[in-house]
Amino acid sequence: MSPPRVSRSWLARTATAAAAGIAMWAAFPPRNWWFLAVLGLGLLFAALFVGAPRARTGAWVGFVFGLAFFVPLLPWIGVYVGPLPWLALAAILAGYLALFGAIATVTMRLPVPPVWFTVSWVLVEALRSAFPFGGFPWGRTAFSQVDGPLLPLASVLGAPGLSAGVALFGSSVAWLLVVLVRAYRRTSTGTTWTPIPDSEGPVLPERSSGVVRIATTAVAIALLAPIAAIAATPASLDRNIATTSARIGAVQGNVPRLGLDFNAQRRAVLDNHVRTTMAYGGAIDSGQTEQPDFVLWPENASDISPLDNADAAAEITAASEAVDAPILVGTLIHNPDGRPTNSVLVWDGARGPVARYDKHIVQPFGEYLPWRPFFRLFSSYADMAGDFRPGTGPTVVDVPGRSGTVTVGVATCWEVAFDRAARQSVREGAQMLFVPTNNATFGRTEMTYQQLAMSQVRAVEHGRAVVVAATSGVSAVIEPDGSISRQSGVFTSDVLTGRLPLHDDMTLATRLGPWPEVLAIIAAVAGLLFALRSRTRFSLRPRRVAARATGDTKELDGIGD
């Protein structure tokens, strides 16, 4: 006995959702197959649109997509703490995609479904990037596009706009194909169209042609939008427009060992960075490389605070004198309230610390542990989490360079995933961005490459050069167009040098700030409320009537599964 049609439809949707999630994962670094994100969201659109499934089916489709995407994306979470945190986080994030599936299924019954698919996608990405515990933006669609032609959208509408561009492109192409296939089937079967009163919403040939035109227009807009973005903000993509520049050296000193306890040898980590910087100073003295305006060390380069430890201060001073330039030092500072801050000190060999930045967005389950007594029940690693205090004040530091003071925006490690971090720095006058990071606790996983892509998006979003200094790799020098001009390996010592353009202008994305995302969220919520209030009868009834008029039994069977 053959299985019921609904069961076959459910299995087909499930398989399509799983394939879509895997395609989305493959779009992310280190593969960078950006086009698979477009394909993945196109498949997800088809799974949620064809046959007009119920909201609960849409939720299931979204959940399957989320699992197929996040499970292979995030294994670095559990590389040293076991699979439970990794799989639990993947399941929670898949829950957000289940919410998306339910919302999109309902709102896509409104006219021009790709628009509602897109704004619903932006809504749910915003939700999981903010809640709970400050959110988890990892895996945002925008971060899969560093090698793709849609990347310039970030300079106009920010990272949320880039995510929206991918969603609109994929869903519009899928919608156009669905419409064309339906039109072909009706034509090939020689269907005779029976007039139906307009109040019932007939799907007449003229209306079908109109839908094709709308779908084609949506695809064209999605393709032309990046070109318009380049025209709107040429400075953000031209590395030669800046009138001033600074020569930098980014030091990757490496760590003595991998794992969660890499920093048990804090002095060895500091010594590694001092030794590598001293060698850099020797190369400068011998004329092998040019004198830098300043040098950048990564996060945790000196977890022995030079403000409290005279030996650490002396080592950093000696390194600064060796290169005859200030060093931006990633360190931990112990505060009077007993809670440390993850800080960057601008250390001048002659004057000591001249500026300081304390990390504003501290990482849950790493730098602090919410609900500590509760999570202690599930993992023996819970007590290894810190109790860091979030920083306040400016997100920029003024660095005295050889050619004048340079205003550097700092987004330490985890912070680069959040839109507000880099945006605040640029609005406060940052001429370039600095991302000190420590990825040693994640071993040789894909995490470091996924994070590097975030810095590339930020470069384009704000039209700024970005320097990523990593304790153990990957360190990189990123141009304002998002391209990587220099890059280190992992678990090796290295020094990356280069002259970076310094920009004072702002891209449209920086000026607009969060407003494009806010408007998309408002549109998604309004569309959902309108669709729920209308109980979707205006959408489903015309399709039932038209299907009965044309004798399309497959269409009738597919509606509402």
Protein language model features and the residues they cover:
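Short, conserved active-site loops that position catalytic residues or coordinate cofactors/metal ions
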Residues: 28-45, 69-72, 252-253, 289-304, ...
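Soluble catalytic regions of membrane-associated enzymes that act on cell-envelope
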Residues: 232-365, 396-404, 410, 414, ...
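Flexible, glycine- and charge-enriched loops at secondary-structure boundaries
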Residues: 89, 93, 262-270, 445-448
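Membrane-embedded alpha-helical bundles of multi-pass enzymes
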Residues: 2-234, 443-444, 455-458, 470-472, ...
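CN hydrolase (nitrilase-like) catalytic-core segments centered on the catalytic cysteine
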Residues: 80, 84, 118-119, 302, ...
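Active-site catalytic loop in hydrolytic enzyme cores
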Residues: 77-84, 130-159, 318-321, 341-423, ...
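Short loop/turn motifs at secondary-structure junctions
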Residues: 137, 290-291, 407, 429
